[in-house]
């Protein structure tokens, strides 16, 4: 009712890219635990939250546990907002020394598309239109703006993602690829994954669900 306060005790499960995990996990956890009592109002509801503990897991690797099929040997390509994390998996173990990271992820992609549209049409396209194109795939008929957007998205798959993997000496016809993260939709809709041994995990919450599952497993020990 009016004036009620939503009180909860919570555990935080969060993630870091595998390449940065060992170096940053303690400082990241300390940052999350810095303010353990939180009092705030959101959309008219007052919250009183107590953080009991926080654990840090490997980003991309967490989403892996939700992937269907035999992924005991595969290459996880986690396309997030800030980074693309490339995580080799051998016999269900993550090979940290072989992990790679790129900053040409979805935020970079959206800005690049906006710059391309402005340079060719002298007008701006909104970020929401690009995100809609990423999620829904190409629609027909296409206007002059969407034509540029679709081409940029297709080129991104070929020139940024697949070519990057080839530069790291991965044989795309022989390597099982598992695309996760919000950018997996780009590969699914514009990257012709059926031409490769590729699976696109479309649940953008897969990493978060992985953190929750891994945390619950630890709590039950």
PLM regions and their residue ranges:
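Glycine/GP-enriched mid-protein hinge/lid loop-to-helix segment characteristic of carbohydrate kinases
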Residues: 88-126
